[in-house]
Amino acid sequence: MIEVRYFARYREELDCDGERLPWSAELDSLEALRQRLLARGGAWQVLAEQCLMCARNQELCSLAEPLADGDEVAFFPPVTGG
């Protein structure tokens, strides 16, 4: 299983803070996972943003990062502050 978490605006727009998805060989990268989520259509298109940030096992990474069974993935918009 892969634990997927959504933060900030993504959590609000998706009305979902996270979910567990079965891992498979087709989910070999964060990009493959993102494409599976985008295929849901509708609000899930928010994950198509160029500025999307992601983390694997609580470390920032790129969408090219490989996935493995048991990983935790987080998607979040860029962080700004003041």
PLM features: residue spans?
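Ubiquitin-like/PB1-type beta-grasp interaction modules and other compact soluble beta-rich domains
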Residues: 1-81
